[in-house]
Amino acid sequence: MNHLQQRQLFLENLLVGVNSTFHQMQKHSVNTCCQSLQKILDHLILLQTIHSPAFRLDRMQLRQMQTLACLWIHQHNHGHQAMLGAIKWISPLIKELV
């Protein structure tokens, strides 16, 4: 099994275990005020994973991070620092924002 296959297997196992929990969190906890934020994070996720060999699994993992980021930002009343911190967490390659 090569490195990419091992990585995919690891991500699949990780995602199977936590996906339903994140789905429930997203359904019940993220309000409509976060919708525009989610669109921004969706765009960042797409840009970050478009050239990845394991892009589908990477994207699934980042979507779960996105849910957590939206919850974090919402709990901090959409503060500017909380938003920048969450965006940097999801997309650490974007340095000009921080």
Swiss-Prot record:
InterPro entries: Rotavirus_NSP6 (IPR006950). It holds the Pfam family Rota_NS6. GO terms for cellular component: host cell mitochondrion. It is found in: Host cytoplasm; Host mitochondrion. Keywords: Host cytoplasm, Host mitochondrion. Its main location: host cell. Belongs to the rotavirus A NSP6 family. Interacts with NSP2 and NSP5. This is Non-structural protein 6. It comes from Rotavirus A (strain RVA/Cow/France/RF/1975/G6P6[1]). The lineage of its organism: Viruses, Riboviria, Orthornavirae, Duplornaviricota, Resentoviricetes.
